[in-house]
Amino acid sequence: MTVDYKNTLNLPETSFPMRGDLAKREPDMLKNWYEKNLYQKIRKASKGKKSFILHDGPPYANGNIHIGHAVNKILKDIIIKSKTALGFDSPYIPGWDCHGLPIELKVEGLVGKPNEKISAAEFRQKCREYAAEQVEGQKKDFIRLGVLGDWDNPYLTMNFDTEANIIRTLGKVIENGHLYKGSKPVHWCLDCGSSLAEAEVEYEDKVSPSIYVRFPAESADEIEAKFSAQGRGQGKLSAIIWTTTPWTMPSNRAIAVNADLEYNLVQLGDERVILAAELVESVAKAVGIEHIEILGSVKGDDLELSRFHHPFYDFTVPVILGDHVTTDGGTGLVHTAPDHGLDDFIVGKQYDLPMAGLVSNDGKFISTTEFFAGKGVFEANPLVIEKLQEVGNLLKVEKIKHSYPHCWRHKTPIIFRATPQWFIGMETQGLRQQALGEIKQVRWIPDWGQARIEKMVENRPDWCISRQRTWGVPMTLFVHKETEELHPRTLDLLEEVAKRVERAGIQAWWDLDEKELLGADAETYRKVPDTLDVWFDSGSTYSSVVANRPEFNGQNIDMYLEGSDQHRGWFMSSLMLSTATDSKAPYKQVLTHGFTVDGQGRKMSKSIGNIVTPQEVMDKFGGDILRLWVASTDYTGEMTVSDEILKRAADSYRRIRNTARFLLANLNGFDPKRDLVKPEEMVSLDRWAVACALDAQNEIKDAYDNYQFHTVVQRLMRFCSVEMGSFYLDIIKDRQYTTKADSLARRSCQTALWHIAEALVRWMAPILSFTADEIWQHLPQTESARAEFVFTEEFYQGLFGLGEDEKLDDAYWQQLIKVRSEVNRVLEISRNNKEIGGGLEAEVTVYANDEYRALLAQLGNELRFVLITSKVDIKSLSEKPADLADSELEGIAVSVTRSNAEKCPRCWHYSDEIGVSPEHPTLCARCVENVVGNGEVRHFA
C-alpha cells in the first residue's frame, strides 16, 4: 500500500488571496479606515516627532477630478506616508479653491446673472452652495484613491475664517507698501468682462490680419535733414509700422524706435519710407517691391520727438524711444497704443502720452470713437483696414497664423486693455529683486524649475489683483470719492471688516453700510466694489490657512507640489505674497510633475477619444494599480498612460503580491514570540536574505527621501523578482516544505521570511496602500501587540546586515548567483532537448577553476539545494571534456546528465538512499530523518 506523506510536509497556507480583486475589496478597506479614524491614529502616533509639512495646493471646486488631479494627490499621499514611515509628523490638510469666475458662470446658467433674476447676495449664496457640492463630489474621488488626510476638516478658501485671513493678508501687503492703484493694460476677457491673471491666459494659434501702415511725416523737410538726404529720392515720406491688431490703431499715440538701432530712409518704389536698416530687405520682400535705394541713415536716437500724422485721425504722434523695440520682425518702428500693450504703456508713461480710453468693458468702442463707435474690437479689424485703404495709408495687408493669448475658460481671444485696477508693484520696496533672491533659497525639483520661475519673475508685470466680479473675496477698502486715496485708517478698518467676515462670511462686506465704520467720513469715502483675483486667495494660504491651523503648529512649510503649469500660477502667487508680507518664500522645496498624456504622447481630448479617467481606472484595475502607475512613472516629464501601460502596472503588481503571498503562506504557524531564531544561529543563506532586505531598505528609504518614487518601485521589483523570487525564495522551498516543522533549519528560514515581510509591507505602504493594509492584517502577531494599521509605523528596525566575520558574505552569494545562473542556462537547454524534465531530475557536474572550486566547496552537500538539483559534483576545469560547450561564465563549465537514481515521493529529489528505512521504503534517507528522526541539519542553505 502506498503511503501518502503529504501531511508530513509543511505546505504553504494563507487566507491572503492570490488575486487582489482590488476594485471590489478597496471600498471595504476605505470604510474600515474611516470608521476607525485611521488619519487621527496616524496623528496620535506621530505626535512630538519632527514635522514635515506639505501644503496642499487647492484644486478648483468645479467638475469631476481628472487623471492629472489623481497624479497630483497620489504623489502627495506617497510623500506624506513615506515621511511618516521615515519618522516625521506629517499632517495632510486637503484644500479647495472656491471663489471665482468658473463657479459664477455655472451658477449664472442655473439662476441667471446677479441683479437680474436674483440679488447679488442670493447669487453669492448659490455660488457657495454650488462650490460645497463640488467639493463633496471631488472629495469622494480623492478618498477613493487611498489618499489619507483630514477630509472631515479640509480648508476651503470660502470658509469664513479663511476669507477673513485673506483680507488680513491684503492688509499686510498694504502695510508693507506694495499696493497701488493705476490705470494699466491688463489681460481682459471680453466674455468674462473682467481682467485675467497671467495664469489664466493660454496661448493658442490664431489667424489675424497682418498690416503694414504708413504714418506720413508732418514735415518731410525736417526728416530729410535728419537723414542728410535733402533733395534725394521722391514721393511722400512715411514711417512704416507693422501690426497684427488693426483694431488698436484708433488708440495709437506714438511710434517707438530703439535708440541704438540704425534706421534707413529708403526709396521704396515711388515713395520714401523709414525702416530699421536690418529689416529693409525683409519688408521690401513682404510688400512685393524690388526697387529699393538707401537714401540716408541715422540712429534711432536722432528720430526722437519727430512727428508723424496719425494714419486716419487729425492729429500727429511723436517718435519715442523704447528698449522693447527689436529687429526680430516687423519694421523696427513699433505702433504704440498705451491702452493696449504693457510695453506701450510703460514707455508711454515716460513720455506722458495720453490714454485713449476708447474700448469699454464689453470690448466695444465707446460712442465718441470716430468711424468705429459701437463696434466690437475684432469686428473693427476689417473696418480699420478699409479706412486705411480709403485714406491711402495701407502699404500691405495679408493673413498671418500666430500664437495669441486666449482665456483659459472660454478659449476665446483676449485683449490688452487699460482699466483702473489695483496692483502689487514688482518694483515697489524691491519686491522683484527680493523674490529672485528667495527663489535661490528654495530646492526646486526637478532643478530646471528654478531657472523657469526666475525668468518668469524677471519678466512679469505688476500683479493686477483686482477683479470686477460678484463671487470673490472683496477688496475691503475705502477710498476718497475725489482723490481715490485710501482711508488713513485702512489697516484698522481692514481688521474690523475681517472680524465681521470671520463671523458671517464675505456677504458681511456687501451688507456693510459705510457709516457703521466711517461715521462722518462716509460722506467723503466710498467702498471699493472690486473682488480679489482668485490667485490671491490660493496664493495667501501659507498665511490664511497654514499659519492658523493648529496641526501645523506655526511651522514653516516644507513643500509645495503641483503640476509644472503652477510655476506661473500658485508657486508664483504664493512667492509674491509671502515675499511681500513676510520677506521670505513660503516654501523650502517645490516639486513639479509633468502633464498626463496618452500612450502616444498626445494631450488628452474628447475629440481624439483618448481620455483616461481615474474613476474608470479604479473601477477596472483598482486604486493600487493607479497608484503603482503614478509611482513607477518618472514625474519630471510627461506622464504617459493608456490601457496597455496600466496592464503592465497590473503585471508588476501581481509579482509583488505573489511575493507577499509566498511570505505569508510560509509564515503559517510561525509565532515570533516562540519561534524567532537569533541571527547567529540562522542558516547562512537566511542571514544573507535579511541583509539583502536591509540593503534594499536603505536604498528605498533614500529614494523616498529624495522623492524618487520610480526608483522605489524599481528597487522593490528587483527585490521581489530577482533577489527573492529568482533566487532565495526558489531555494528555500525545499527546506521550508520538507524539514521538520519546528526544526532550526525551518525556523531559521521563517525568521528570515518574517523579517522580510515586516520590512516589505512598510516599503509598499506609501504606494500600494490598500495591499499593504491587507498584508498587515495577515502578518503574525509580535511580542508587543501589533499596531492596528501599517500607516502609523516607521520603517522596520529589525533587519540586520552580515557581520564582518561572516565567511559567506554578500560577495560570496553574488558569485554563487552567477554560477547558479549559468547552471540554470545549461539545465534549460537540457529541458528543451527533452533530456530531463526538471532540475531535480538532473545530476550536474561543475568544472571549475581553483577560485570557483573553493567557492562551491564551502557549501559541501548543500550546494545541490542552492542549484536545485538532486546531485552536484565539482571537478577541476582541467578535467572538462573536450566536447563540452564553453560556459558563458568564465572559469566554469557545466554538464548535465539525467539521474538514474529513484525519485523520493516526498521531496521529489532523486537519491541513491531510497529504501534505507524498512518502515518507509519509498523515502530517501533525508526525508526519513525529517519524518521520524530529529530532523535534517542545515548550515548554509
Curated annotation (Swiss-Prot):
GO biological process entries: isoleucyl-tRNA aminoacylation
Residues noted as binding Zn(2+) in the record, renumbered to the chain: 904, 907, 924, 927
Nucleotide-binding found in the keyword field: yes
Catalytic activity: tRNA(Ile) + L-isoleucine + ATP = L-isoleucyl-tRNA(Ile) + AMP + diphosphate
UniProt keyword annotation of Signal present: no
Binding site for L-isoleucyl-5'-AMP: 562
Cofactor needs: Zn(2+)
EC number of the protein: 6.1.1.5
Sites where the protein binds ATP: 606
Summary of the function given for this chain in its UniProt record: Catalyzes the attachment of isoleucine to tRNA(Ile). As IleRS can inadvertently accommodate and process structurally similar amino acids such as valine, to avoid such errors it has two additional distinct tRNA(Ile)-dependent editing activities. One activity is designated as 'pretransfer' editing and involves the hydrolysis of activated Val-AMP. The other activity is designated 'posttransfer' editing and involves deacylation of mischarged Val-tRNA(Ile).
Comment block on domains: IleRS has two distinct active sites: one for aminoacylation and one for editing. The misactivated valine is translocated from the active site to the editing site, which sterically excludes the correctly activated isoleucine. The single editing site contains two valyl binding pockets, one specific for each substrate (Val-AMP or Val-tRNA(Ile)).
Family to which the UniProt record says this protein belongs: Belongs to the class-I aminoacyl-tRNA synthetase family. IleS type 1 subfamily.
Protein name: Isoleucine--tRNA ligase
Organism listed in the record: Haemophilus influenzae (strain PittGG)
Lineage, highest ranks first: Bacteria, Pseudomonadati, Pseudomonadota, Gammaproteobacteria, Pasteurellales
